[in-house]
Every structure is written in structure tokens, then in C-alpha cells.
Design a protein with these regions (language model features):
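Interdomain hinge and pocket-entrance segments immediately C-terminal to HTH DNA-binding domains
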Residues: 84-100
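Hydrophobic two-helix hairpin corresponding to the core of helix-turn-helix DNA-binding domains
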Residues: 9, 21-22, 58-61
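Alpha-helical linker/hinge and terminal dimerization helices associated
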Residues: 42-43, 64-89
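Short helix-boundary/capping micro-motifs
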Residues: 12-28
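A short LG(V/I)-centered, amphipathic sequence patch enriched
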Residues: 40-57, 80
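Residue cluster at the C-terminal edge of the helix-turn-helix DNA-binding motif
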Residues: 15, 24, 38-46
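The N-cap/first-turn positions of alpha helices
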Residues: 2-5, 29, 61, 95
Length: 100
């Protein structure tokens, strides 16, 4: 499982829509649906129940959401911490010398 899958799941959960989650992530709805199905297969549980065009969170989905949210928040925190340490920054400036 990777962070992209977790982000897709989190967005579907919060937006209650595969389509809205896909739009938020600039991908096709079918891609999000496939990723959620992949997570469900990997975990061996349903995270959402599909009822008459609506999605309902399962108990497993609620638990997984809380964990995904925490993991994604921690990832963002770590990335910000690392970026804020100037001693670790990659030097990207290059000099261009023009001779006549």
C-alpha cells in the first residue's frame, strides 16, 4: 500500500464520493475506484458499502480512515520539518558564464 492509495481513500471518505475524490486528485473516477478495490482486497474487508449510488462507510472503513489520516498528517509534518532545515536543502542555483 502506498500514500497515494491512502490519500484517495481519505478523499473518498471525506467527500463521500468517488467522483469528487477523483476530481480533487486530477484522475479518472475509475482510477480511484480501482485503488479502493485494491485496498479492500489487500485488507480483506469492505471499506465502503455501495447502496443506490451512495457510499456508506463500514466500521472497518472508519478505523482505516482514522489511521490513514494520522499517517498522512505525520507524513506532511515530516516533510515540512525536513524542508525547514536549511542545512539539508539541495542547492539548485547554477551559474551561467557567457564569454565574448
Amino acid at each position: 500500500m502506498d500514500l497515494h492509495k491512502m490519500q484517495y481513500f481519505k478523499d473518498v471518505y471525506e467527500l463521500n464520493s468517488f467522483t469528487k475524490a477523483a476530481n480533487k486528485n486530477f484522475v479518472y473516477q475509475s482510477a480511484v475506484t480501482q485503488q479502493i478495490a485494491s485496498i479492500e482486497k489487500e485488507l480483506g474487508v469492505l471499506l465502503f458499502e455501495r447502496e443506490h449510488g451512495k457510499i456508506v462507510h463500514t466500521q472497518a472503513g472508519k478505523i482505516f480512515y482514522q489511521e490513514c489520516r494520522d499517517i498522512l498528517d505525520e507524513y506532511e509534518h515530516v516533510m515540512e520539518e525536513i524542508k525547514n532545515h536549511s542545512s539539508y536543502k539541495v542547492q539548485t542555483q547554477k551559474k551561467l558564464k557567457i564569454g565574448f
